[in-house]
Amino acid sequence: MENQKQYPMTQEGFEKLEQELEELKTVKRPEVVEKIKVARSFGDLSENSEYDAAKDEQGFIEQDIQRIEHMIRNALIIEDSGDNNVVQIGKTVTFIEIPDGEEEVYQIVGSAEADAFNGKISNESPIAKSLIGKHLDDEVRVPLPNGAEIKVKITNIQSQ
């Protein structure tokens, strides 16, 4: 049997996936079944755009359900170590860029719960890979997509 990819995530991220799955199964799936039923009542299915759209939507919902069930089955919940001196998944990290002093704050989460617009970056991102395992006050080199790198200093690490 081949090894399944594990999905590291916070407890909060795991619970959000469970909620999303529940909504897909109890709300979205029944809604699309009803849309298909209504579209069928229009008659000829060969030229029924409502029916085609509802069937497409059903396919997307079923794919989402399978994807989320897979992630839940293979979730690796990262427990907070309580150590706010070392960066790990689940921690919120504040750092300043050296030498300009620009401050940035990110929570490092598993890829399944990453949301850069809300300050949650994937543990697989270059910046998170550079920070994980480092300590408060460490200076770290972070590679940039253009091949350059920046130097940052970790100024705060906190639990969620």
From Swiss-Prot:
GO molecular function per UniProt: DNA binding; RNA polymerase binding
InterPro entries xrefs: GreA/GreB_C_sf, TF_GreA/GreB_CS, Tscrpt_elong_fac_GreA, Tscrpt_elong_fac_GreA/B, Tscrpt_elong_fac_GreA/B_C, Tscrpt_elong_fac_GreA/B_fam, Tscrpt_elong_fac_GreA/B_N, Tscrpt_elong_fac_GreA/B_N_sf
Source species, domain of life: Bacteria
Gene3D superfamilies tied to this protein: Transcription elongation factor, GreA/GreB, C-terminal domain, Transcription elongation factor, GreA/GreB, N-terminal domain
Statement: the UniProt record of this protein carries the keyword Amino-acid biosynthesis: no
Record bears the keyword Transcription regulation: yes
A Pfam family that the UniProt record links to this protein: GreA_GreB_N
Coiled-coil regions, chain positions: 4-70
GO biological process: DNA-templated transcription elongation; regulation of DNA-templated transcription elongation
Main function: Necessary for efficient RNA polymerase transcription elongation past template-encoded arresting sites. The arresting sites in DNA have the property of trapping a certain fraction of elongating RNA polymerases that pass through, resulting in locked ternary complexes. Cleavage of the nascent transcript by cleavage factors such as GreA or GreB allows the resumption of elongation from the new 3'terminus. GreA releases sequences of 2 to 3 nucleotides.
Family, per entry: Belongs to the GreA/GreB family.
PANTHER family: TRANSCRIPTION ELONGATION FACTOR GREA
Protein name: Transcription elongation factor GreA
Species name: Staphylococcus carnosus (strain TM300)
